[in-house]
Each structure stands twice: as structure tokens, then as C-alpha cells.
């Protein structure tokens, strides 16, 4: 064991640790203003300097070597640290008591106090005039006059988030942070992730929502505030007593500022963070210790919470009376629901009432929905929105490796030698996950292959970008697999020991030659060989895929083809490898885990399994149907056939997200009784007979499960708004009125019941999940399992199976429908935008919907930016403004999903075609004809949107440029980089 001495005391050192790592490991107080553990040493502040064997070195970048004698507070070290701090304070006013950042976590303030700074050696000099403080961005501001040029914001922007917008202008007379080439923040390539604001150690970068709100005296008008600042700044840096005053004020703030750990309610990455609130005001989101994201966020998680306090929230139960919604009491609404649903069940029997669950609500609430369906209505007719997106991926994995979840964690993706992204755009759909790929690719030599019909950010960054014809991914995947087997590049030992049906599989592959693949996909043979070589040479391959794969007629077969390729090359059962279907919603994984599926009970136990069913029958006190129920699509058919009379839908906008939305409108209108539980009057809710006001995630407790299979707790940050209630409380009230003996006092009671019935979760509970704790399901003994299949695949014989599927060709359209219309997420919005469209800041970046048109098609049809187009499919028509961009090519169009309008929402164009195995709609197989109604107009995307801007990559903060400044005097005696 390596040991070093610190101030004469011996300490153990972890392998590869720096001196500062060791100092922090043992909780020794030491200055370190520019230190960010998530990135490499920045080396800009010099406050961490220590003395080692008579030499002054930066502890953040100096490796701890056995036998080192380190002094933190020797005269030499202390003098260097103090000089470093004085250089920083020359750029900053310490007026802490009236500062918005005086919240106990200001690194500059805390370090000045730790170092017992009494006087400022160099007088403060402002860099710019007050009016030059950059207030242009909707979410945060930058004050150069408070910036100490530590570079943390630059380092995380360049090398952690890898958005590559920020840099430090070291050549300026007074160095400062700049955006792109020095433009206003709102005119830059900034994607509003907020990472720079999160790491800023002072008040140079601040959330606008904090300004004037955080402190007791920070909300004063400027003419009153300025004199106070001048008074404070005259005395505070030189008097430790005044620091004490500011700490008293900070302590007072903490009494009224509530800090609550939560889990993000948007995508499936599962970021967790603290949300700071004052009353109902959301002051800021502060990530720190999340097991998934650490200090990272995206624009939605950091700034997209305006919907919580939206005036559009439903706050009282609504009952349809005379074709109008009328506010009612909870008793009236619940009694009506119990009477109507109970009556329909009694009259028509099982199968007359269907249940649609939600990927937005908690695990506990999803569990109760399936329990209500099976216990009280004797039906397996329960489903969730995974049917619209991820069911094919789950199907492909269940048939090949036995479990329908990610093979490992996001850390495994970052470790992989090669990442292949197929039909997914994680930079916009799963932004924080994408940062880990971008960082590994930029800094650690990871290779990246992207297969997509649209050129998005990850495609631009890739080593190989392939644009296959729509719906042909299975062909190139099988061709690459065949080629690798033919070349002897497959992992024979792995296959022999772990996989069945290899001989049959090679026969299925026979026709998938490189020539055939080139003809069917449009990808050259040379490119496919390069892909095969890259897989061969990689130290671990991870494949990530999304709706560009799953939302096709052959989505489940293509998902299986991905798994087949990984099995053939031995890329399972080890870190840094495996299959990673990217779950779209915050809890779509959890909704499936909890059994809101027609064929599966909680914990993926089959309804056809007599033993599993008997267990639930004993717990629920009723027989469980032994045949799978209807899925979402089949329920709609049953409504049209008059077999299903009522539906209970929670937190889902079926009228927008289902395919062929015009048909869905007609179907929902046929229901005898329809209950919708939601926060907003969604399009689907407009068909309801009763609408129950539900609470969003910040107003309740429970758990979410992310794309890694990771379960995390969320805590209640705000009281419920008006008379709204948590979904689990509403469900319990309904169940009791229907005669159920439900007595849950807290979501933990529900979780414990679920875990007692589900072996995958048997060792999970709220104590395990307390605080920042988490649990990854994946083992039948219920233990935490970050990496799947270490003990074999999830079949009785522990062996995987090659799936034996041929390619399913895409749907054909009449010749008049000559343009393929693709669809997907935008970074700023989440899915249909029901939540994010409540944010003024987000709307300022993306104020309206549009359709992307290629330059080639624009030239051919005479289309310019802003042109008004009518898109007509066999199932409907939309009117949209055009955005001409090379992100699409030829006769391909792209329509963002974030619309709730019948004039612009994609599903008023999509048709009934579906995946062969799972009924998932083939949204991606939609063609239209384009009619030009107006040849040009105003661009639908503001010029302030970062998509117009160019990124400015560099290797972090580039501290050498600081050291090369004329007159710069080094404080260290040795430094390998100087």
C-alpha cells in the first residue's frame, strides 16, 4: 500500500491518486478553488499548492508517490497559497452579505475564510462597465467583474459536457470567459445545459432565478443595493468579523431555502440533483452527487421546471356535464368513477375496462395501476407507453439474452473502446448520457460509429457516419455479422460456451452479403468492412439504439440483430460492452418493471407462469387471468368493436402519441366512460368524463428507474398545488371505493409489497435507496446488479440464443407520397412538449414547430426558410413552415415531436403499420407528398438557436496560455507542464 506523509502524519493512498485526492479522501481542509473532481486537473488557481521535499507543487496535478513528505501549511506553501488567493481577489468583490451566492457553498468565500485572509494585497479592478454584464440568456447571466478566471466553467463545457462553447481569453489584458468568439451568450452555441453555472465557485455565473431571490437583502432595488455593496466591499475583505455577519445571513437563508433531492422527470438518463425552493418558487437546480450524472445536467433538467407552477395546472377534479367540464369535489368525482367503472365491470365482465399507465409517474404508482386492473377488474388489459417506443428492443433482448434491459451502466458505455449508435440521437434525446460518449471520444480514444438517416450532432462527431435507407438497419447489421464470421473475426470460444443456434444462425445469414447490403441499404461495402474492422479491433463494443430502430415494422427483429452481433463478437458479460436500448422517459423502464404490461406481472414474471400467478393470487386474494391481455393498440380495436366500454388512463397523452391520431380521436369518443388522471388538460383529457388533478414529481415521493435499470428515490420538494394529489393517493381512494382493502401510508409501503412479490427487487428497499443511494435490478436473488449476465444469460441453461429472423421490409406507399417524414426529439423540448412548452425560456429558443427540408429538395421545389408547406399522407395532413438544413438529405423530411396541435403534430400523419412482434407503431415508416402553399417566409427557428452556431473545441481551459502571458510569475517550483 502506497503511503505519504501530510503534515507529518502517514496516510494511505489509492492507486493513481494525486496529492489533493488523498487530502480530500481523508477530509483534510485545504484550499482548492479550481478543483472539479469530474474533470482532469485545471491548474489555474494555484490555491492548492503544497510543499513536497522542499519544492512547491500543485497538489491537484501531482501524483502521490510512496514516501512523499507533504506540507500543507509550511511557510513556503502558505505564502504561495496566499499570493494565489490575492491574485484571484484582484478580480472579485467580496460583498458576501448582499450577494445572491451567499448560500454557504461559495468556494471563494469559504476559501478566503479557511485561509484567514484579512487584507487584499491587490486592489480590485473591474473589467467592464456594469451595463456590460451579460444578461442576454434566458436562464443565466455572466458578470465579468466577479469572474476570477478559474476556468472551471470552460473545462466542464469543453471536456465534460463537450458542448465546446466556452473558452478563456487568456490574451486579453484582463482575461475573462467568452462564448464562441466573444458574442453575447444568447447569440452563441450554448445549449443551456447550465453546467457552467453549477460549477462556478463564486457569483460570476448565476441562475437568473436566484437573482434578487436568494438573500434577505439581495432583492433590493439597484439604487439601494449599490450603496450597500460599496459599504460591504469597503470592510468585508479586511475584517473576518464581517465574514461572520455574512455567514449569519447565509444561515438565515438556509432556514427558508429548502434543498430537496429529486430525480429528473424528463428523459430516461435518470439525473438526480437538489432542487432549491423558497415557498413555491424554484430558485435553482444543483447537481452534485448523483450516481448517474454527478454534476451534469441538460437544459430541461436544469431550467425546464416552469410547468410546476403553470397557471394551466388542473387543481380540482373536473366532471363533464352537458359537454363542459365543471369543477367538482373529490368525493363527487371518486364516487362517480367507482359507480361507473364498477357498473360497467358488473354488466360486461373482465375485459370491459382497460388501463393505460404512465412512464412519468413513479414505480409505486405504476404498481398500483396493474394491481387495480388485476385485483379489482380481473383483467390483464393494462399497458404503458413503452408500447410506442421500446417494446421491440425489449422483445429482441428477451429472445437473445433473456433480459430486456441495458447490459450495464452509463459508465460502461464510457469505458467501451467502440460505441455504435443506431437510430438514436442521444445528444438531444439523452443529453447527459451523450456527454459521456463525447468525452470518451474526445479525450480517451473511444471510437464512434453512427447509423442514422439524419445528420445530428453525434453523426458529425463520429468516425464513421452511415446513412442507411430507412428501415434497413437489420440488413447492414446482419451483413457485418456475416462478414466478421466469414473472416474468422467472431469470438468462437464465447459462442461455444455461451450461445445456442450458431449453425442455424449462419444459415439465416447466408444471403446477407456485403453486395446485398449495399444494394438494400445504400451503404458501400467498403464502409461496412470498416465497421467490421473497427468492431474487431475494439476493446469492448457497446451498441446504443432508439426509436429509429424500434418504430419500424421490423423493430424487434433489428433489435435482435443488434444483440446477435454483440453475441457473435463476445461483447456481453464484461464491462464496457453490451446492448443499450435508450429508454426515452424518466420511468418507462420502471413502468415495465412494475408489470403495467398485458403479458407480464411485476418483475417480468409471466402471467402464463402458474407459479408466479399463484403467488400474486395469494397476495391479491383473487384469481389472475392466465392469458395475456390487450396492449394499447388492441385496446383501441376492442373499443371500436364495442368490447371495451371504459378506460382509466394515467399520465399519458394517447390522443397525441398514438399513431394515426385522427383514428384515435374517433376511438376515444366511443368510450362509455373515460377517466384521465393528469396535471394538465391534455388533448387526451379533453375526451374524458372525469379528470383527476395529479401531482408532478416535485410534489410527491417515490422512485424512478432509469435506462440503466437503476432505481432512485425522489423526495417531495413542494406541497401539492390546490387540491391535486399524488397519483398513488388517488388510486388508493378509487380502489377503496371499489371495495379494496388498501391501506398504504407511504410509497415505501407499496415498494415493499412489490419487492416481496418480485425476486428481482427482493433486496431493494427505501433504506438502500436513501439519499443518493440507488439499486440496479438484474439478479434473481435480488442483489444490486450493475452489470448483467456475469453468471450467465437469463435462461435456465444460462446460454444466450441467436435470433433467427429475416429482414422485414418497410411499408410501401403510393408513388404520390414521395417524401419520407422522420420524427424525433429536440434537445430543448421533451416529446410532445406538454411540460416544456410551459417554459418561456425554452420557448424563446424554439417558439414554434417546423419541418426540416434538405437543400436538394428545397432547390427542386422552390422552398426557402419559412415556406408554408402542406404535408399530406394517406392518414392526414399538416401545415408547417420549412427549415432548410443539410441535417436531412434528398427526399427526407424531419418533424420534431414537440407539438400538441392538430395542425403540426406528427401522428396526424402516421398510419397503422406496426412492428411484427409487439404492435409498436411504425412511426418512422411514414411518407407524404409536399405541397408548397407559400414559397418563403420568416424562419421558424430564431437565429439565437444554437443550431445555427459553430462549436469551438479546444482541450479544456488551456492553462499553458495563462502561464505564457507576459509578466506571469509562477508560484510553483516544479511542474511537468510548465
State what each model feature region is.
Residues 410, 699-720, 730-737:
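Glycine/threonine-rich phosphate-binding loop and adjacent beta-strand/alpha-helix elements that clamp
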Residues 53, 65, 276-281, 873-874:
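Short acidic-glycine loop/turn motifs at beta-strand connectors
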Residues 46-262:
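Fe-S ferredoxin-like electron-transfer domains
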Residues 11-66:
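N-terminal cofactor/phosphate-binding cores enriched in small/glycine residues
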Residues 93, 198, 229, 236, ...:
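Catalytic alpha/large subunits of respiratory electron-transfer oxidoreductases
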Residues 582, 589-598, 749-841, 969-971:
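Long, low-complexity segments enriched in small/aliphatic residues
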Residues 721-723, 727-772, 832, 836-852, ...:
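Long, contiguous, secondary-structure-rich segments that constitute the structural scaffold
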Residues 5, 66-72, 179-182, 460-468, ...:
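Short beta-alpha connecting loops at secondary-structure transitions
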Amino acid at each position: 500500500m502506497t503511503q505519504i506523509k501530510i503534515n507529518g502524519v502517514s496516510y494511505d493512498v489509492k492507486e493513481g491518486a494525486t496529492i489533493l485526492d488523498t487530502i480530500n479522501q481523508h477530509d483534510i481542509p485545504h484550499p482548492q478553488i479550481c478543483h472539479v473532481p469530474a474533470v482532469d486537473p485545471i491548474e489555474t488557481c494555484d490555491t492548492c499548492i503544497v510543499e513536497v521535499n522542499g519544492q512547491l507543487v500543485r497538489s491537484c496535478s501531482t501524483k502521490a508517490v510512496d514516501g512523499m513528505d507533504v506540507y500543507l501549511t509550511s511557510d513556503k506553501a502558505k505564502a504561495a497559497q496566499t499570493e494565489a488567493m490575492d491574485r484571484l481577489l484582484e478580480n472579485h468583490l467580496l460583498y458576501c452579505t448582499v450577494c445572491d451566492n451567499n448560500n454557504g457553498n461559495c468556494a471563494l468565500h469559504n476559501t478566503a475564510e479557511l485561509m484567514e485572509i484579512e487584507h487584499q494585497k491587490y486592489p480590485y479592478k473591474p473589467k467592464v462597465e456594469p451595463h456590460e454584464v451579460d444578461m442576454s440568456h434566458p436562464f443565466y447571466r455572466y458578470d465579468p467583474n466577479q469572474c476570477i478566471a478559474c476556468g472551471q466553467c470552460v473545462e466542464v463545457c469543453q471536456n465534460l459536457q463537450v458542448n465546446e462553447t466556452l473558452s478563456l481569453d487568456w490574451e486579453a489584458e484582463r482575461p475573462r470567459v467568452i462564448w464562441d468568439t466573444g458574442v453575447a451568450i444568447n447569440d452563441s452555441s450554448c445549449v443551456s445545459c447550465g453546467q457552467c453555472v453549477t460549477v462556478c465557485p463564486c457569483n460570476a455565473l448565476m441562475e437568473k432565478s436566484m437573482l434578487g431571490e436568494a438573500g434577505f437583502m439581495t432583492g433590493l432595488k439597484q439604487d439601494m443595493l449599490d450603496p450597500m455593496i460599496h459599504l460591504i466591499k469597503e470592510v468585508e475583505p479586511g475584517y473576518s468579523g464581517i465574514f461572520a455577519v455574512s455567514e449569519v445571513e447565509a444561515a438565515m437563508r438556509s432556514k427558508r431555502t429548502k434543498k430537496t433531492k429529486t430525480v429528473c422527470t424528463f428523459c430516461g438518463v435518470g439525473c438526480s440533483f437538489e432542487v432549491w425552493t423558497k415557498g413555491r418558487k424554484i430558485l435553482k437546480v444543483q447537481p452534485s452527487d448523483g450516481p448517474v450524472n454527478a454534476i451534469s445536467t441538460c437544459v430541461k433538467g436544469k431550467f425546464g421546471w416552469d410547468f410546476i407552477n403553470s397557471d394551466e395546472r388542473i387543481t380540482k377534479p373536473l366532471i363533464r356535464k352537458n359537454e363542459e367540464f365543471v369543477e367538482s369535489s373529490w368525493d363527487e368525482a371518486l364516487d362517480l368513477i367507482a359507480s361507473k367503472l364498477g357498473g360497467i365491470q358488473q354488466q360486461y365482465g373482465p375485459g370491459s375496462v382497460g388501463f393505460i399507465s404512465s412512464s412519468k409517474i413513479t414505480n409505486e404508482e405504476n404498481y398500483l395501476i396493474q394491481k387495480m386492473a388485476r385485483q379489482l377488474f380481473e383483467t390483464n388489459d393494462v399497458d404503458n407507453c413503452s408500447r410506442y417506443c421500446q417494446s421491440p428492443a425489449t422483445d429482441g433482448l428477451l429472445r437473445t439474452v433473456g433480459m430486456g434491459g441495458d447490459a450495464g451502466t452509463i459508465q460502461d458505455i464510457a469505458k467501451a473502446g467502440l460505441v455504435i449508435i443506431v437510430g438514436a440521437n442521444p445528444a438531444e434525446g439523452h443529453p447527459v448520457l451523450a456527454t459521456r460518449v463525447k468525452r470518451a471520444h474526445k479525450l480517451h480514444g473511444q471510437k464512434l460509429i453512427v447509423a442514422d438517416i439524419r445528420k445530428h450532432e453525434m453523426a458529425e462527431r463520429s468516425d464513421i457516419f452511415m446513412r442507411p435507407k430507412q428501415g434497413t438497419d437489420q440488413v447492414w447489421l446482419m451483413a457485418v455479422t456475416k462478414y466478421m464470421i466469414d473472416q474468422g473475426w467472431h469470438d468462437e470460444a464465447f459462442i461455444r460456451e455461451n450461445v445456442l443456434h450458431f449453425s442455424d444462425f449462419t444459415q439465416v445469414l447466408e444471403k446477407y452479403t456485403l453486395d446485398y447490403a449495399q444494394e438494400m441499404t445504400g451503404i458501400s461495402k467498403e464502409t461496412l468492412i470498416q465497421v467490421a474492422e473497427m468492431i474487431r479491433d475494439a476493446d469492448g463494443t457497446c451498441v446504443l439504439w432508439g426509436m429509429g430502430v424500434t418504430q419500424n415494422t421490423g423493430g424487434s427483429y433489428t433489435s435482435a440483430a443488434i444483440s446477435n452481433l454483440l453475441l457473435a463478437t463476445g461483447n456481453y458479460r464484461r464491462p464496457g460492452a453490451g446492448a443499450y436500448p435508450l429508454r426515452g422517459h424518466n420511468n418507462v423502464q420502471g413502468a415495465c418493471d412494475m408489470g403495467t404490461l398485458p403479458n407480464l406481472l411485476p418483475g417480468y414474471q409471466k402471467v402464463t407462469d402458474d407459479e408466479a400467478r399463484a403467488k400474486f393470487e395469494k397476495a391479491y386474494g383473487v384469481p389472475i387471468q392466465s392469458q395475456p391481455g390487450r396492449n394499447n393498440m388492441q385496446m383501441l380495436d376492442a373499443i371500436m368493436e364495442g368490447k371495451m366500454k371504459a378506460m382509466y388512463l394515467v399520465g399519458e397523452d394517447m390522443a397525441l402519441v398514438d399513431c394515426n391520431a385522427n383514428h384515435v380521436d374517433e376511438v376515444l369518443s366511443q368510450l362509455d366512460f373515460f377517466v384521465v388522471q393528469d396535471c394538465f388538460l391534455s388533448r387526451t383529457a379533453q375526451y374524458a368524463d372525469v379528470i383527476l388533478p395529479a401531482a408532478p414529481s416535485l410534489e410527491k415521493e417515490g422512485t424512478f428507474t432509469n435506462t440503466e435499470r437503476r432505481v432512485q428515490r425522489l423526495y417531495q420538494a413542494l406541497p401539492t398545488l390546490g387540491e391535486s394529489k399524488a397519483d398513488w393517493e388517488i388510486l388508493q381512494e378509487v380502489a377503496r371505493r371499489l371495495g379494496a382493502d388498501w391501506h398504504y401510508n407511504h410509497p415505501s409501503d407499496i415498494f415493499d409489497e412489490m419487492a416481496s412479490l418480485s425476486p428481482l427487487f427482493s433486496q431493494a428497499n427505501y433504506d438502500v435507496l436513501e439519499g443518493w443511494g440507488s439499486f440496479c435490478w438484474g439478479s434473481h436473488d435480488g442483489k444490486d446488479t450493475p452489470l448483467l449476465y456475469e453468471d450467465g444469460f437469463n435462461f435456465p441453461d444460462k446460454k444466450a440464443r441467436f435470433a433467427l429472423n429475416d429482414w422485414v421490409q418497410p411499408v410501401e406507399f403510393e408513388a404520390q407520397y414521395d417524401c419520407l417524414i422522420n420524427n424525433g426529439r429536440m434537445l430543448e423540448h421533451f416529446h410532445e412538449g406538454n411540460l416544456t412548452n410551459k417554459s418561456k425560456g425554452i420557448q424563446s429558443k424554439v417558439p414554434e414547430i417546423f419541418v426540416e427540408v434538405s437543400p436538394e429538395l428545397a432547390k427542386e421545389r422552390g422552398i426557402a426558410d419559412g415556406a408554408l408547406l402542406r404535408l399530406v399522407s394517406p392518414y392526414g395532413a399538416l401545415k408547417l413552415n420549412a427549415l432548410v438544413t443539410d441535417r436531412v438529405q434528398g427526399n427526407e423530411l424531419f418533424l420534431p415531436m414537440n407539438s400538441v396541435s392538430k395542425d403540426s403534430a406528427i401522428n396526424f400523419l402516421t398510419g397503422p403499420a406496426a412492428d411484427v412482434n409487439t404492435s409498436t407503431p411504425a412511426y418512422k415508416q411514414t411518407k407524404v407528398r409536399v405541397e408548397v402553399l407559400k414559397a418563403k417566409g420568416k424562419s421558424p427557428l430564431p437565429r439565437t438557436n444554437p443550431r445555427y452556431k459553430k462549436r469551438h473545441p479546444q482541450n479544456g481551459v488551456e492553462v499553458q496560455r495563462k502561464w505564457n502571458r507576459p509578466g506571469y510569475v509562477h508560484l510553483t517550483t516544479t511542474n511537468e507542464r510548465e
